[in-house]
Amino acid sequence: MHDDPQQLELLRVARIGRAQGLKGEVTVRLYTDDPEWRFEPDSVLYSQDGETEYIVEGSRTFKDRWILKLEGVDDRNAAEALNGVELYGEVDDAEDMLEADEWYPKDLIGLEARLVEGNGLGLPAGQVVGKVVDVVDSPAQSLLKIRLTEPVVTGQNSKGEDVVEKTALVPFVEALVPDIDLEEQYLTLDPPGGLIPGCGMI
């Protein structure tokens, strides 16, 4: 047990999913871009409040999924009991977070969303799309909720009234969100046509 869990600065790195096999292994959904480092043998992971420690006994990948073996979790029943548990890793300082390409959701909220240079839509680099107002969990990956700079009329409803979109959800993956600059308070987007109302729609 850590001496003072309340003083830990923790970063969410994974959520435990289903049990894998019969020997206590679990699948995990990643929230980190550096799982090789986070899941090294003997690495310590924590519950959200820092009160519970999970020691990594081993890790591997299978069909693009990460699978963990945690100390003391030695059979399928024990593994299944952890389904849904979120794992947090200790952060030394903000510089380490930036070097590891890891962020707290609160760090992303408020960032200006701009189109990346050479974006697939052929629109000007740096064009402001909106501002990040939330980070939403989904079964596949986290989503950035972006409040659009200008609301967009996307059609009409059955009553003939305009349907106005004020926000967009963008999967938080490197292919769509290639750059994040916390110092300058912006991130860049490379969305496909139709993902963001008003950007690349015909």
Swiss-Prot record:
Q: Which family does it belong to?
A: Belongs to the RimM family.
Question: What's the chief localization of this chain?
Answer: cytoplasm
Gene name linked to the record: rimM
Name where it's found: Cytoplasm
Could you list this entry's UniProt keywords, alphabetically sorted.
Answer: Chaperone, Cytoplasm, Ribosome biogenesis, rRNA processing
Q: One GO CC term of this entry? A: ribosome
> Which GO biological process annotations does it have?
ribosomal small subunit biogenesis; rRNA processing
Q: Which residues are in the PRC barrel domain? A: 100-195
How does the record describe its quaternary structure? Binds ribosomal protein uS19.
MF terms from GO for this chain are: ribosome binding
Report the Pfam families cross-referenced here: PRC_RimM (PF24986), RimM (PF01782)
Q: What InterPro entries would the database entry show? A: PRC_barrel-like_sf, PRC_RimM, RimM, RimM_N, RimM_N_sf, Transl_B-barrel_sf
Described purpose of this protein according to its UniProt entry:
An accessory protein needed during the final step in the assembly of 30S ribosomal subunit, possibly for assembly of the head region. Essential for efficient processing of 16S rRNA. May be needed both before and after RbfA during the maturation of 16S rRNA. It has affinity for free ribosomal 30S subunits but not for 70S ribosomes.
Protein name (Swiss-Prot/TrEMBL): Ribosome maturation factor RimM
The domain-related comment in the record is: The PRC barrel domain binds ribosomal protein uS19.
NCBIfam families per the UniProt record, alphabetical: 16S_RimM (TIGR02273)
